[in-house]
């Protein structure tokens, strides 16, 4: 079984940290989240997110999610995948709208120093500094007058702090990618049946490739894709002309969703100084590192709300080593090689199934 998709777009904006406020003023259906994907120097990996959802009918919630994947060299140590969900009244927003507290958890941001302090109580206590500029896209840069989603991404951030895992606290250093999103006017799970988010952290920790693909529920709607390329600590291109293909179809026992066995991507665009850039990567996907039945980790009171809002969500994560080849002005300029994080979120079966 194989499939292929392509996207063509050109609209994006470069942004600064001043653009990272929370926007909770909309009266209609809204989902907003701020996330960090973190590659640590000891080979471990982590993710954290604080979100806000206006689900309609006066129901507003504040979900939190976090993971910690130990280094592959740590044998027989299980990853941590967890979440908590609170009613919106537990979420306190700062006057400048950059920072939030949710009971004993918090995500504080100083836009002047470009520094974050994030605590997931009992798990993470992290200081993160944004080192370079970011970019934003509305509807993945495509000409969609409905304007139903916006993403803001800052690929280069440094991180230090601690994690408490399986009863043991340890210090961490590394790099992180910030991904923020805002979905509005309708349930975000009406917009697509599958999202695939991936990040390649070169072993130098100074070159990073980000990719986000969105597969629409309505087959007549366009496939949406965006990527970015950072070399030597500088964001040099946002890539919106992308080809994506898969081979194979694996299925986990008891789960209805089909997963790719091989992926191939050609990501294209222009550098900020106008040179054509192309990134190619191919990989056979290895054993899954985690499978999360999202409804199972929500409290009982939230399950019915979440199932209406988010379908039957499962999150599949692979962590493995891959390489990608970078071409600028038709010349090979770099090979990115390192930790590859691939996260596929399935919420509905495709209409063709």
Curated annotation (Swiss-Prot):
Gene Ontology biological-process entries: ER to Golgi ceramide transport; response to oxidative stress; sphingolipid biosynthetic process
Pfam families: Svf1, Svf1_C
Keywords: Cytoplasm, Nucleus
Gene Ontology CC, one term: cytosol
Coiled coil: none
InterPro entries: Ceramide-binding_SVF1 (IPR051385), Svf1-like_C (IPR033394), Svf1-like_N (IPR013931)
Compartment annotation: Cytoplasm; Nucleus
Protein name: Survival factor 2
Higher taxonomy: Eukaryota, Fungi, Dikarya, Ascomycota, Taphrinomycotina
């Amino acid at each position: 079984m194989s499939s292929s998709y392509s996207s063509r777009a050109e609209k994006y904006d470069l942004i600064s940290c001043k653009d990272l406020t929370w926007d909770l003023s909309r009266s209609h259906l809204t989902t907003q989240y701020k996330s960090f994907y973190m590659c640590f120097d000891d080979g471990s990996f982590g993710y954290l997110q604080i979100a806000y959802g206006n689900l309609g009918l006066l129901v507003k919630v504040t979900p939190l999610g976090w993971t910690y994947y130990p280094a592959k060299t740590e044998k027989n140590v299980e990853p941590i995948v967890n979440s908590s969900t609170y009613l919106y009244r537990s979420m306190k927003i700062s006057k400048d709208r950059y920072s939030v507290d949710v009971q004993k958890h918090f995500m504080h941001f100083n836009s002047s120093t470009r520094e974050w302090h994030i605590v997931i109580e009992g798990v993470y206590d992290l200081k993160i500094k944004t080192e370079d500029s970011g970019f934003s896209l509305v509807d993945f840069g495509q000409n969609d007058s409905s304007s139903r989603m916006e993403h803001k991404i800052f690929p280069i951030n440094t991180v230090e702090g601690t994690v408490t895992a399986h009863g043991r606290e340890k210090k961490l250093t590394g790099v992180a990618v910030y991904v923020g999103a805002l979905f509005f006017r309708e349930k975000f799970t009406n917009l697509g049946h599958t999202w695939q988010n991936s990040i390649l952290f070169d072993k130098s920790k100074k070159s990073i490739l980000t990719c986000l693909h969105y597969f629409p529920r309505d087959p007549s709607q366009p496939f949406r894709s965006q990527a970015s390329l950072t070399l030597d600590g500088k964001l040099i291109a946002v890539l919106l002309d992308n080809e994506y293909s898969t081979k194979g179809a694996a299925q986990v026992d008891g789960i209805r969703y089909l997963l790719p066995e091989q992926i191939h991507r050609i990501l294209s665009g222009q550098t900020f100084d106008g040179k054509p850039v192309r990134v190619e990567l191919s990989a056979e996907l290895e054993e899954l590192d985690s499978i999360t039945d999202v409804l199972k980790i929500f409290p009982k009171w939230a399950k019915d709300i979440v199932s209406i809002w988010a379908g039957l969500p499962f999150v599949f994560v692979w962590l493995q080593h891959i390489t990608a080849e970078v071409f600028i002005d038709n010349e090979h300029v770099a090979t990115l090689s390192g930790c590859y994080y691939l996260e596929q979120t399935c919420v509905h079966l495709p209409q063709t199934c």
